[in-house]
């Protein structure tokens, strides 16, 4: 994937369009502890993409296959 550099500034609409077109994943992990005792642990994975982009990549890794329904 090539990185394109431009000298002009981008508008907010262009940035949002690019994020939805390419997609972005934010992976976060937070741990709060006091005196060595873990009080809170949070793990989050946030995916921002258009439906078309998500389906394209989800199909590539097999996430769009429907599960068999028991009879």
From Swiss-Prot:
Subcellular location: Gas vesicle shell
Induction and repression of expression: Gas vesicles are abundant in low light, and collapse after exposure to high light.
Keyword Disulfide bond: no
Beta-strand 1: annotated span: 23-32
Location of region: Alpha helix 1: 12-22
Region feature (Beta-strand 2): 37-46
Matches recorded under InterPro entries: Gas-vesicle_GvpA-like, Gas_vesicle_GvpA, GvpA, GvpA-like_CS
GO molecular function, one term: structural molecule activity
Keyword 4Fe-4S in record: no
Keywords: Gas vesicle
Segments for region (Alpha helix 2): 47-70
GO cellular component, one term: vesicle membrane
Main location: other
Name of a matching Pfam family: Gas_vesicle
Ranges for region Beta turn: 33-36
Biotech use: Can be used as an oxygen carrier in mammalian cell culture; addition of 1.8% GVs in the medium enhanced the maximum glucose utilization rate by about 30%. The GVs have both GvpA and GvpC.
Assembly with partners or alone: The gas vesicle shell is 2 nm thick and consists of a single layer of this protein. It forms helical ribs nearly perpendicular to the long axis of the vesicle.
Notes concerning its domains: Solid state NMR studies suggest the protein has an alpha-helix beta-strand beta-strand alpha-helix structure. The beta-strands are thought to make an extended cross-beta structure which forms the hydrophobic core of the GV.
HAMAP family, alphabetized: Gas_vesicle_A
Function: Gas vesicles (GV) are hollow, gas filled proteinaceous nanostructures found in some microorganisms. During planktonic growth they allow positioning of the organism at a favorable depth for light or nutrient acquisition. GVs are highly permeable to gas. GvpA forms the protein shell. The ratio of GvpA:GvpC is estimated to be 33:1 and more recently 25:1.
Family statement drawn from the similarity comment of this UniProt entry: Belongs to the gas vesicle GvpA family.
Name assigned to this protein: Gas vesicle protein A
Organism: Dolichospermum flosaquae
Lineage summary: Bacteria, Bacillati, Cyanobacteriota, Cyanophyceae, Nostocales
Protein's gene: gvpA
């Amino acid at each position: 994937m090539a990185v394109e550099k431009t000298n002009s500034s981008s508008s907010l609409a262009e940035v949002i369009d690019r994020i939805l077109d390419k997609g972005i994943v934010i992976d976060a992990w937070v741990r709060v502890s006091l005196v060595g005792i873990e009080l809170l642990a949070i793990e989050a994975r946030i995916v921002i993409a258009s439906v078309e982009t998500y389906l394209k990549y989800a199909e590539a890794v097999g996430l769009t296959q429907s599960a068999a329904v028991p009879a």
